[in-house]
Amino acid sequence: MATWNSRGLRGSFLEELVNMTNDKYRSQKLAPITPVRMDKEHRQITLAYFDQRSTIDYIGAVQGIPVCFDAKECATDRFPLANVHEHQIRFMKEFEEQDGIAFLLIYFKAKDTFMYLPYAKLDEFWRRMEEGGAKHFKYEELDPAYEISTYSGTFVHYLEQIQMDLEQRDSR
C-alpha cells in the first residue's frame, strides 16, 4: 500500500488537485509553481525548522509574475479565518509589496466549489476580524467571478483568476 510520510496517505483533496494542475502548467511552460515543503527527515536534527513557521503552500511564477498562495479546504460555506495564520498574512503582504501576487485557493466542500481569494480581499476580512468583527467570512461575500472551473483537463484552473486579479489591480 502506498504511504506518504509515516501516517498513510496524507494531503488534502485540494492540494492533490492543485499539484496535478501545477504539473500541467509546468509541462505547458505556463507556470513553474512548486509546493513549499519542510525537510521532515532532518527537522529533529536541525532545530531551526521549529524556529520559523512555514509560510505558504506554493510559490513560483506565472509567465514572469511571482505568485505565492495557500490551498485551504472548508467543510461549510463559512471559512474560519483561524485556518489562516498571522505569519501567512504577513508573508503574503510582504510578497505583494514586492509586486508579487498572493492569494488563497479555497475548496468549499459543501458547495463542491473552488474559489480564488485575492490577498486584498483576504486582508479586508482579516482586518475586520482584528477590529472585533466576524472571525470568518461567508461564501456569499466572495466575488462569484473568482469561482474556478475545470478547463481542458486542468482540475483547478486558476490562471484566469490571476489574470482577472491583475486586471482589477491595473484599473485601480
Show the residue positions of the predicted features.
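Mg2+/Mn2+-dependent nuclease catalytic core
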Residues: C74-Q98
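Nucleic-acid nuclease catalytic cores
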Residues: K93-D123
